[in-house]
A protein has these predicted regions:
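TRAFAC-class small GTPase G-domain
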Residues: 1-185
Length: 185
């Protein structure tokens, strides 16, 4: 979830940014659903998030705080604790894992129907990650499988990405930043 804090600060990330760990919850935050997007690209070994981690970075006009939430089944129930204060969602899909698309669709539907999200016009950025993997689904196919065209009450955008190389991430963050700025006016 992403949010704008008092004083014009907000919270998102992509590889290549310098990160600081923070062990407190800011008033509003950005939930990121993939470890690859929330750690420095210079790291050699990216391991899955266990539970969650909190990271910060700045763009030219906003400061972002990212709650990197584990997508593992046993941790998904933690997501909802961060919905109220968030002002945007980044939902990361492994486009190379065709078998888990059904699970991704179910989790997306659960998220969209949560009382803290359902009636809010909150922007959603989808990262169709691992586009570098052979036989990965295109962002168009991911969009179709997740039925993204059925999302009528929230602005959304999907980007094909390769988080390890940072490809597609700036485009998505730029879109999200524009959406957050629009919400503030």
């Amino acid at each position: 979830m992403a949010g704008v804090k008092e004083g014009g600060e907000c919270s998102v990330s992509w590889p290549g940014q310098q990160w600081e760990n923070h062990h407190h919850q800011p008033p509003q935050a950005l939930q990121c659903k993939s470890t690859s997007f929330c750690h420095n690209a210079q790291m050699q070994d990216i391991v899955p998030t266990i539970g969650f981690s909190i990271e910060k970075f700045k763009t030219s006009s906003l400061s972002f705080t990212v709650f990197d939430m584990s997508g593992q089944g046993r941790y998904r129930n933690l997501w909802e604790h961060y919905y109220k204060e968030g002002q945007a969602i980044i939902f990361v899909i492994d486009s190379a894992d065709k078998l888990r698309m059904v699970v991704a669709k179910e989790e997306l539907d659960t998220l969209l129907n949560h009382p803290d999200i359902k009636h809010r016009r909150i922007p959603i950025l989808f990262f169709a990650n691992k586009m570098d993997v052979r036989d990965a689904l295109s962002s168009v196919k991911v969009s179709q499988l997740l039925c993204l065209d059925n999302i009528k009450d929230k602005p959304w955008h999907i980007c094909a990405t390769n988080a390890l190389k940072g490809e597609g991430l700036p485009e998505g963050v730029d879109w999200l930043q524009d959406q957050i700025k629009t919400m503030r006016t």
